């Protein structure tokens, strides 16, 4: 069973803005990443009854491991 997840953007003033609803956590995380790449900012995925299940931290920098 796929759940429906809401994607929100955290605004600079601390408020939240609902963006969209998508089906499935994988799709929600993917969409959240695309939104952040296009418009920047902090986003999170919310599942009713569970709360925030994923967040995108704009200050996180991916570092590739060097072998």
Predicted regions and their residues:
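General helical structural elements
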Residues: 13-14, 33-35, 67
């Amino acid at each position: 069973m796929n759940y429906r997840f809401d994607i929100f953007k955290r605004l600079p003033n601390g408020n939240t803005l609902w963006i969209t609803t998508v089906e499935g956590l994988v799709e929600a995380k993917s969409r959240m990443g695309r939104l952040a790449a296009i418009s920047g900012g902090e986003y999170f995925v919310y599942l009713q009854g569970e709360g925030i299940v994923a967040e995108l931290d704009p200050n996180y920098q991916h570092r590739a491991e060097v072998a």
